[in-house]
Amino acid sequence: MWHEARKHERKLRGMMVDYKKRAERRREYYEKIKKDPAQFLQVHGRACKVHLDSAVALAAESPVNMMPWQGDTNNMIDRFDVRAHLDHIPDYTPPLLTTISPEQESDERKCNYERYRGLVQNDFAGISEEQCLYQIYIDELYGGLQRPSEDEKKKLAEKKASIGYTYEDSTVAEVEKVTEKPEEEESPAEEESNSDEDEVIPDIDVEVDVDELNQEQVADLNKQATTYGMADGDFVRMLRKDKEEAEAIKHAKALEEEKAMYSGRRSRRQRREFREKRLRGRKISPPSYARRDSPTYDPYKRSPSESSSESRSRSRSPTPGREEKITFITSFGGSDEEAAAAAAAAAASGAATGKPPAPPQPGGPAPGRNASARRRSSTSSSSSSASRTSSSRSRSSSSSRSRRGGGYYRSGRHARSRSRSWSRSRSRSRRYSRSRSRGRRHSGGGSRDGHRYSRSPARRGGYGPRRRSRSRSRSGDRYRRGGRGPRHHSSSRSSWSLSPSRSRSLTRSRSPSLSRSRSLSRSRSQSHSPSPPREKLSRPAASPAVGEKLKKTEPAAGKETGAAKPKLTPQEKLKLRMQKALNRQFKADKKAAQEKMIQQEHERQEREDELRAMARKIRMKERERREKEREEWERQYSRQSRSPSPRYSREYSSSRRRSRSRSRSPHYRH
């Protein structure tokens, strides 16, 4: 049922479209053949009898029924004529004092212009009345001549003549010839030679082109018009007015035709072309959100460690300002000389980057280590609270020149320093991190970063660390272990990276206090026990200084994030929304284009595979056909020829069998 309804609806729609197209074609046809109605007006006169009966007609035309009119025997009329009762026709004598208003006078002059303008033009052109009447007669018989084309008009305009007519009794041999157009009035219309026929406006007679007349011709034309009841200067002024009106009507009609042309279902493309043509010369201004500049925000304060580490983590190459001189640790005792050297290195780095060195904090890391922490390639965990609300997994890839300087904590319990990002501790700040680092590390005590964890040396007697994180380190050189001296628990296990190392970390955080941040946290904390069982128990209280730092930075970071969100105006919100929509659309278009390219490539591959398979089939069929022909030929040849010796026939048959098996083997099929 639904299919029948759809079929009927399609049929009706097709009929409606056909009717519309037919109506448009009919309208175009009538517009094409439309002409001036005055051209179809014809007056025919012929002699006819008043009385159909011949006897009555003879009696009526006999001189007996004729009588002189008003006693004049030269003027005989029928006695049954009504004019016989007009005994006297008085002459009209206008009054001497006639009061005519200016409006009536102007109307009378306009009427005289409409009545006699054809005669004025004929008098100006020097054309007699007989020539005009004969031309009208020719036009009534054969119709008006076709309008000249544009090229002919230009040629004739150069010769100062539009269309030349030859009259039988024409004796006018002037250069100026006339163009003609039939009039609606009884007066004949003939024009001057330099007048151009108006093609579009049929209501206005063919006018003299007043723009091409000089002053003498204008004065002569006005003088000719004064004899027909017009004031001096009226004729040329009214001609100009008629020309302006004709141009206005022509323009309006062209606009109407253009609108009619670009209407309907079939001309959407034409309407679009017309719109593009109209907008081609117009300068289109960009939209408001694209015209305005980006809004500028007041700078807000951030912690120096956050800003510096964030800027460092985004750059993949070391900036020239941060390329520093590499210093090597020569003593591991945490002596005063080492602290002084670390402070000097921090001052040098601060002078290089234009920032003052950070003062050493009690209970925190040593000054040398604090200076080296600012040179690391990613955000430290103390500055990670700015991105505390992000819930996505972050990957940061950074390549920077990093090294670790300074000494370690001097621990009274002889515990080695461990990373705070312990993946299996049961504290609230648990993080699971995976890191993959590539590069060369030449270390004196084993390579280790913030995502590599090593057990205490109680289990291992040397410096080689055992990693509990899932990390793979590919290095051109093997890790060279240092000398195993006496049990020196405060010795350093730090390493230097002489080449920029790329590391990717996937950090998962389960606690709300520590965020998922784009960082390779390399901070270290003190542990209170070297043995693994004591480690797990003492892990929550392992780093009191870092915990205090985190507690202090949490509210500060909250304030910063609160202050870092300026209120957006509706225009800026709209701009952001528009930019997001544009980015989304651009990504969708790009994705669609890629999918289309992939699909086209897939189709091309399928076509190639099909062609290859068809070629393979054709070759196989050709090979089979050749083998059949060869077998037929061999069979016929063996019948016709004499049978050879048994030894020869045996060798021949074996060679044939061997060649046939080779040809049929799949290795030879392509």
Swiss-Prot record:
Phosphorylated in vitro by CLK4. InterPro entries: SWAP (IPR040397), SWAP_N_domain (IPR019147). Its main location: nucleus. Pfam families: DRY_EERY (PF09750). The modification Phosphothreonine is found at T327, T569. GO terms for biological process: mRNA processing; RNA splicing. Residues 265-283, 411-443, 481-491, 655-670 have a biased composition (Basic residues). It is found in: Nucleus. Residues 340-355, 378-400, 492-529, 638-647 have a biased composition (Low complexity). Residues 182-214 have a biased composition (Acidic residues). Residues 290-313, 586-613, 621-637 have a biased composition (Basic and acidic residues). Residues 356-365 have a biased composition (Pro residues). The modification Phosphoserine is found at S101, S285, S294, S331, S335, S543. Keywords: Coiled coil, mRNA processing, mRNA splicing, Nucleus, Phosphoprotein. Residues 581-643 form a coiled coil. PANTHER family: CLK4-ASSOCIATING SERINE_ARGININE RICH PROTEIN, SPLICING FACTOR SUPPRESSOR OF WHITE APRICOT. Probably functions as an alternative splicing regulator. May regulate the mRNA splicing of genes such as CLK1. May act by regulating members of the CLK kinase family. Belongs to the splicing factor SR family. This is CLK4-associating serine/arginine rich protein. It comes from Bos taurus. The lineage of its organism: Eukaryota, Metazoa, Chordata, Craniata, Vertebrata.
